[in-house]
Amino acid sequence: MHGEILLVRLSDLCPSLESALIDVINRGYNKPRYKYGVIDTPRIKYSLLRDLNIKDPEQSYIALFLAPASDISIEKDDSAAEVTRKFISKFPEVSFSTHRSQLDDYSDVESRILGTVGIKKIDRGHELTAFTSFYPQLSGKMMDFIHGVGKKVGSKTIIADVIAEHDLVKFYEKHQYREIRRTPCKIDKRTKLVIGSVMEDGVKAKKDFTMVEMERVL
């Protein structure tokens, strides 16, 4: 089956697409949130631009890897594992050859999203964000695609901030990222809010953790 890649500039977000993406991104980030028990708040609490800390939406992008339109029904409360099972059952194989910048209708887009990956503009280039995958062996393809987008928009480096306790460092090293620094993140014992980290405001955690800054040269 042939899927397609939708590349959206974040300044072009429409309300219906943002609503779908909030559900999808939270579902994707809930998987490590529940598995490792470090972060206690959803990834998106208010809006995409605010919670992803997007300062320059004109130069920030998100790619959606879409399955073909079908009768799959994705419920708001479905877990990442449940969504993956639904997609594999319907589409044992999916390839991607078509790129688009918009859809005519976003009303059912959530039931097609196999994965998402974005880059946001920062002073040093771009930073990886909104990385979710609900289909086997898709992560590498999404990485390759978004690195290509980074090159096209003139970035020389892509930064990734990852939580060490989520066991992500080796995954990024496999994709030619190198570790730059580690930052201990403490929580306020009373409020459970994370103190003085690179994360957006309002993040609560169940325990102290470590952020790892990683970099890939394009």
Kindly give the residue locations of the regions a language model identified:
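A short beta-loop-alpha structural element at the N-terminal edge
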Residues: 2-23
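Glycine-rich phosphate-binding loop
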Residues: 136-142
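Conserved beta-strand-loop-alpha-helix junction that forms the acyl-donor binding cleft
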Residues: 133-135, 159-173, 178, 182-194
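A conserved short alpha-helix in the GNAT/GCN5 acetyltransferase fold that borders
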Residues: 142-152
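Conserved acetyl-CoA binding element of GNAT-fold acetyltransferases
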Residues: 97, 106-110, 115-136, 161-162
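Conserved GNAT acetyl-CoA-binding A-motif
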Residues: 125, 150-167
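Short hydrophobic/aromatic beta-strand or adjacent loop that forms the aromatic wall/cage
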Residues: 59-60, 206-215
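Conserved GNAT-fold acetyl-CoA-binding loop/helix
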Residues: 26-63, 67-90
